[in-house]
Swiss-Prot record:
Name this polypeptide is given: Gene 15 protein
Upper classification of the organism: Viruses, Duplodnaviria, Heunggongvirae, Uroviricota, Caudoviricetes
Pfam family, one: VG15
Length: 275
């Protein structure tokens, strides 16, 4: 597996740097050691993303010629910039193991973004008009959280892979905006964890849907939707009884999902693409 191999590689090298407080120069040297391997894995992930896009496009539109597009390779400048959030932990004396984990997750996320970027770029670059009917979020089941499960349950309702930088559907944004009392600072705080659709460690993919009745992950989405409906009923009952922490049905439904997951009532792997 591409990311599993990379995670082990990064942990081995980064663990050598947890004792001293890293200077900027030492941090850059560590990144220089890691970069060739991350770049290689990035290329592999980009190729897989492209193969997936080509196979789905060919399946639903065999009459169309291949959409030629150059592969996007990881650039050093991107890598340094995207690893910056992980630098602080390793810049402390006696850095905790959590700092190594954070760097590992950051590199894994960068590689997983390669396939996502390749698919999104191929769709944007496609000369055939309107062959993509929508976008759907799907999971592999390794690191899916309750928030991700909510997005998966929506199916191919997303009109674009990126909506103004805020990767949430309109209904959720409206709920969060109202919950914040239309206060911009509160709204920013509510949406801060979701400004990027894929958090570190997230294994979700966003896929183009060429046929709304036949797309990878449809069966898992239908299972997720039923779970969301059931959790919504629980949330409504709690709100009506006054036992809920808030009156926001969307938020309380997510909380209900988290409780069910904690109790072991379902496994995230049941809602994965390959389930």
């Amino acid at each position: 597996m591409i990311t599993a191999g990379l995670a082990g590689y990064v942990q081995r090298f980064a663990s050598l740097f947890i004792r001293p407080a890293l200077s900027i120069a030492e941090w850059l040297r560590l990144l220089q050691v890691l970069f060739p391997e991350v770049q290689r894995r990035y290329a592999e992930a980009a190729d897989l993303g492209r193969d997936f896009y080509d196979s789905q496009r060919r399946l639903h539109h065999p009459e169309l010629p291949r959409n030629e597009r150059l592969r996007s390779d990881l650039q050093w400048e991107w890598f340094v910039r995207n690893m910056e959030p992980a630098r602080k932990g390793l810049s402390q004396a006696d850095s905790p193991q959590a700092a190594v984990t954070k760097l590992t997750l950051a590199t894994v996320r960068e590689v997983e973004m390669a396939g996502r970027r390749q698919i999104i770029g191929a769709v944007k670059n496609d000369p055939a008009p309107k062959i993509v009917k929508g976008w759907a979020r799907v999971a592999t089941g390794r690191e899916t959280c309750a928030w991700c499960l909510m997005l998966i349950s929506r199916g191919p309702e997303y009109l674009s892979a990126d909506s103004g930088g805020l990767h949430l559907d309109t209904e959720t944004v409206v709920d969060l905006w109202n919950e914040a009392g239309r206060d911009l600072e509160k709204f920013r705080e509510e949406t801060k964890p979701h400004i990027e659709e894929w958090h570190a460690g997230c294994d979700c993919l966003v896929v183009p849907v060429f046929d709304v009745e036949n797309w990878p992950g449809k069966a898992a989405q239908e299972r997720a939707l039923q779970l969301w409906i059931d959790a919504g009923k629980e949330a409504s009952q709690l709100i009506a009884s006054g036992k809920a922490r808030s009156k926001n049905e969307n938020k309380e439904t997510i909380n209900a999902l988290r409780r069910r997951l904690y109790r072991g009532e379902f496994a995230m792997s049941d809602y994965a693409l390959a389930a």
